[in-house]
């Protein structure tokens, strides 16, 4: 494991400009379902899962103790100056601003529910962490499109890069906007696989086509909060070159997270049974600088 490379990723952040596609992929919207992870969309899921299960098994009280002050996220605002954004809005089509900014993180916490230490993975019923959970991507990821009025920039903080659904969602955005760039900034939490999508230069015809299709399927002219659920929009695989471009970005993040999570787990299970151990010191140095 190249720790110097990982340290550089965390200290400097990572970004990737995504390709523009003039044509939207074939769409067939189904609510209440989602894609299961597949090797085609990245083997990192299966590698990461072992480490996530290890951390899931430890008590949430201990997790909070060992990650105190290491999970801060202050990344979104860092992009305002580079993109000349002075005013923002989230939801409200009648409001005008420089950008639509939507934060889809479910929580600032690392975990969903408190639980004690589990002796075995047999006790794990689900991923209790807000990390590497592909079910966190809901149809709300497309809501910013319905909030655009005069804005030319859209910024979306997504909670995970895991799975087929997020890859497909970014692919759709790459036809709705001519400029799409992915970021994992140093100011983000490097305990999580969250990231930011920045979109500019709207493609009006494709946006109108997309909105018309969604309104037809949902039988509503306005956004319905009841649609903020798991979904499948694209059933076929998107372009292989696009998948590889996305994975070249996300792999660097998961490589870094694997190292971070390894340090965290080693610290939490250290024989010293104290925060004052070599793994925790490395973790603090890496994440706090």
UniProtKB/Swiss-Prot annotation:
- EC number(s) for this protein? 2.1.1.56
What keywords are annotated for this sequence in UniProt?
Methyltransferase, mRNA capping, mRNA processing, S-adenosyl-L-methionine, Transferase, Virion
Main subcellular location: virion
Could you tell me which InterPro entries the record lists for this protein? Poxvirus_mRNA-cap_ssu, Poxvirus_mRNA-cap_ssu_sf
Gene Ontology CC annotations of this record = virion component
- What is a single molecular function from GO for this protein? mRNA 5'-cap (guanine-N7-)-methyltransferase activity
A Pfam family found in this protein is: Pox_mRNA-cap
Q: What is catalysed by this protein?
A: a 5'-end (5'-triphosphoguanosine)-ribonucleoside in mRNA + S-adenosyl-L-methionine = a 5'-end (N(7)-methyl 5'-triphosphoguanosine)-ribonucleoside in mRNA + S-adenosyl-L-homocysteine
State the disulfide connectivity. Answer: none
Spell out the subcellular localization from the entry. Answer: Virion
Purpose of the protein: Catalyzes the last reaction in the mRNA cap formation pathway.
According to the record's subunit comment, the protein's assembly and interactions are:
Heterodimer of a large and a small subunit.
**What is the protein named?**
mRNA-capping enzyme small subunit
Name the lineage.
Viruses, Varidnaviria, Bamfordvirae, Nucleocytoviricota, Pokkesviricetes
